[in-house]
Amino acid sequence: LVELIRSAAPAAILSAHSFNRYQVNVNGPARAWGEALAGLCHYPVTEDIGYPTPGCLGTYAGRELGIPTITLEIERGLSREAVIALHLPVMREALLFWEKWKGN
């Protein structure tokens, strides 16, 4: 993954993960992007999940490299249908938001 990030040089990174404490976790210059997504899924926006995460994607890409990075921490225990219904619009908005933002 490190080599992919280095070679692809992404302008932003969006990842999804399941966690007991659902949230829109932002790293690097991603706060406005995260707040836009949180408005759709009503998850809190966080910059820290409460414990050290050395080696995680957000720490590496967001904090160390300065790439806007969001980890959408999806609520555990939701059915597949509920995850799709809630998060497909969030993922779509993530892409649309980024397209608008980078155009400014």
Regions found by a protein language model. Name each.
Residues 1-104:
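Structured catalytic-domain cores with a bias toward divalent-metal coordination
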